Amino acid sequence: MVTAFANAGYSAVLWIDPYPTRLPKLSDLKRLRNAKSVVAHSDERIELHRPAALPVEPLPLGSLLNQMLCWRPVRQRLREFAAGGHCVIGIGRPSALALWALKNLPHERSFADVLDNFPAFYRGVSRLSMKRRLKDVCRTVTDVFCSSNQLALDIQAVRHDAITVLNGYPTDHLPQPSIMATRKYVGYLGTIGEWFDWPLVCEIARALPEIPVRLVGPEFVPRPADLPPNIEFLGERPFNEMADFVRDFAVGLIPFKRNELTDSVDPIKFYEYRSLGVPVWSTDFGEMRLRDANDGVNKIQRGQDWRALWDEARVTVVEPHAIASFKEAVSWAKRGNVPGVVEG
């Protein structure tokens, strides 16, 4: 979406990286140990700024501490940027800094891009804090866009004019899909978190013992003790390698549990798989509830005939024109074309 803004005629885009908006947990130590350096955005039209912040925002004086100790440089840069002329403010993750920008920077228009049920990721005081920030942001901006129909329904309790703008994907420079005969993996691309249905994935692996089940992405929950030997872990990999991994998938998995967190999700991996002609096996959750075989999706649950599903996937042929049409429809050039906001 950021590149879509740059391509739409804006002379510059200032991207403020999200900072911690909840209290720290012990599992964060593992994230810090495994953290890899991120390459700065290569588009010279896009400026990246990573603000310093203490992980205390949910506390009564947390925002004040960050205002006093950490945010002077980012506030100054935001003021300079907004003073340059026609300015649109976009809010991804609700935060105290986002609210400060909405209230203090001159701008022509503003929008909230609600990608997830943010409070569902948090617990306790952090959850209450995020609920409040989300409501405040949605009431303050001029437009609210939600990445799934369920999110739009939920947010309409606060903003009746919230609309659904489904996720997009940068499809312009994707390679051509591979031929099915060269694909050998049941694959998953993405984070392995509390929403990941481990029992289902293990059942699939045991039913297809000669087929490698390849998992690509960071892990934030423990692995089961009795993992089948054909499950492979590749860990977190750079974004520019994702297409090459997906091209090796005979099937793309989206094995999510159905709960409060996933009920409003439109998974990016659906677009990644489909843009490269990969058949999708998905549980019935969130926006995936509205997709079926016409969308290249096979709904899965425990107890299915996995051998029959695998054999069916191996003979599935996705026509090149169907892939091209899908890629065009979900590109950010189409998805991000929101009148009055994206045009520079």
Predicted segments, located by residue:
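Conserved donor-binding/catalytic core segment of Leloir-type glycosyltransferases
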Residues: 179-196, 201-205, 214-216
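Membrane-proximal helix-turn-helix segments that form the acceptor-binding/catalytic region
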Residues: 73-86, 112, 122, 126-144
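N-terminal subdomain of nucleotide-sugar transferases
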Residues: 1-34, 206-208
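Nucleotide-activated donor-binding/catalytic signature segment of Leloir-type glycosyltransferases, i.e.
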Residues: 221-248
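Carbohydrate-associated surface elements
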Residues: 150, 165-171, 177-182
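A short, active-site helix/loop in glycosyltransferases that binds the activated sugar's phosphate group
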Residues: 121, 140-161, 289-291
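Nucleotide-sugar-dependent
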Residues: 196, 240, 244-245, 254-275, ...
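A charged, aromatic-enriched C-terminal amphipathic alpha-helix characteristic of glycosyltransferases
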Residues: 300-344
